[in-house]
Amino acid sequence: LAYATATKLYETGEEFKEKLFGIRITGIFSEIRSLVEVKHKNNKDEKAIGRREIRNIKSDIETKLKEFQERYQGLKASRIHIRLLKAFPGMKVMKRQDAFNDLKEKLTKKGTLVFGMDLKENVTGRIQNYLSGIIRAIVTGLLVLLQFAMVIALSVFLKGYTIYIYTFIQILSIIIIIGLVNDHRNSSYKISWICIIAALPITGHIMFLLWGNRRGRKIEQSLLAKLKHGTGFYDYDPEIQRQFTEKYPMKSRLSRYLEANSFPLYKNNQVTYYPMGEDTFEAIFAEIEKASRFILINFYIVGEGVLWDRMHALLLKKIKEGVRVLFLYDDFGAVLRTPKNFKRSLESEGFEVRVFNPILKYTDKLYMNYRSHQKIIVVDGNAGFTGGMNLADEYVNLVTRFGVWKDNAVRVEGDAVWGLTVTFLQMWEASADSAPLDYNPFRPTKDFPANDVYCQVISDGPANNPRNPVENSYKQMINSAKKILYITTPYLIIEDDMRDALTTAAISGIDVRIITPKIPDKRAVKLLTNYNYGRLLESGVRIFEYVPGFIHAKTIISEDCAIVGTINMDFRSFHLHYECGVWVCDEGTVDVIKKDLLETMEQCREVTYEEWKRRPFYIKAFQMVLNLFAPLM
């Protein structure tokens, strides 16, 4: 048993020969194998290994592991569960199985086996929920439910005064509806509230006064002021815009629109596309290894696990080398999967940490909806990453939640990295009440080779409503496409104007294709996504469902430009969350992305209009009801 175990470990280490923080560790597997080979060089029959012999071998292995720990004292071990069971698929004898389980448990508890792992490897990750986070989430939920209960109680109480209340409600309804009709917010959002008010005469009115009006506008204005402070550090070069217009005359309208919304156009960039989360994080780790000045990290979800262990250890190493690490995460995205003292623990280790929008701060405004969904990593101001990935094991397929998890990202090296840096620092400022930040120390330190790869970093959020640069960028991408339009999105909950743009493109002869997940992470959202297929399919849009699992990638490409980032095609991304992405105009980059999307479509099942029409009646009815509240979900 021990011989087979050591052999399995040795082969894993030998095959991939990875390094962890510069220390090659595959030798430990060789040492264990040599140890066991000596003990059993004359015994090839695994069944002959008795329980006493197993205990002796286990003791020797533990001794070697202890020696290895002492040799590399201070090296944080990745908490990787070793899947020894795969080495012994035919084991059926209970006594031997007990011995095997005992050995596996002992090794796992020790936490001493450190892998310089390739994230594509067969390593088991974990999803760990913390009691403190669960309690915070429950408290938040109870506060919201309490508000609902108070609304209902007040409604019941007021119904006792029917004669007086009726006239008041009628007048109030007229006032609210007139206000909504003349509001600059999205029409679908307004229609949803009108339906609620009409369906729930008293309760709906109170709900709107609590959560539907713009009483929180002062908070948004304060946040917007902090975001605008960052735009003052942007540099605009009219010559770049002129050169771009000469090369891409049909795209200059979008570029000028983005510049008018404080997103400069940059050239001299090198863009690398990563089709999976595993590829992305290996590149991120390699970039962090080279950091000498600072590392900026912003994620929506942070979950402790194998991926976090490796990131944490690497960042600790860089902090000890004198590198400044600014770590920003969204409170809602991390509440369940990080311990209560997570922020304080990181700060005690030398991290600079800020938490965006604590979930208990604005429960009266349902402010848990207004999240930072951005994902940004910047190293020394010279290279940056953004995409759909989060800092949790499922994003690199170390755990299986919804089949194969497909994500994507881009690495940008060049002048456009400053756009990612400013976007990060804007959210950093917005996450604390502090003096205005000087962005200049975070500028790049090197000049980049001249080329014609054009990029604009875009970002958006509810503070910008009703101006939505991200949504309008998508619409302009759709309207300016000449040959192809390929989109990947985990959620497809779109408004009439976006749907009209897609159907018009398809009817005009553009090859419009959309990839969505076959396996959903949210069933209600999947039903709404499926509901939105109808008019698109009828107009000639081709829709593909990713059969292996869940596609979390957020991408839109035409024949010569692309947007890769954090933006889902739904109301939440376009209106309720803070998002970011990179608009790239470069045929070479677009060809790489297109190749990946075409290969992904080969793993998909295409949905037909005839199939969509054959949905069961009860599904159709439920989808129609859900669609009324789509902007509020």
Predicted regions and their residues:
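N-terminal localization/anchoring segments of enzymes in phospholipid and broader phosphate metabolism
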Residues: 13, 105, 109, 114-472, ...
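Residue-level detector of alpha-helical secondary structure
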Residues: 6-10, 14-17, 29, 33, ...
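Extended hydrophobic/aromatic segments used for targeting, binding, or gating
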Residues: 497-500, 514-517, 521-538
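Short, mixed-charge low-complexity intrinsically disordered segments
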Residues: 80-90, 96, 110-115
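Conserved catalytic cores of phosphodiester-cleaving nucleases, focusing on short active-site segments
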Residues: 1, 34-36
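Charged, low-complexity interaction regions
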Residues: 42-48, 73
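Helical hairpin unit composed of two closely spaced alpha helices linked by a short loop
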Residues: 491-510
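A structural signal for isolated positions on well-ordered beta-strands in alpha/beta enzyme cores
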Residues: 81, 296, 324-328, 486, ...
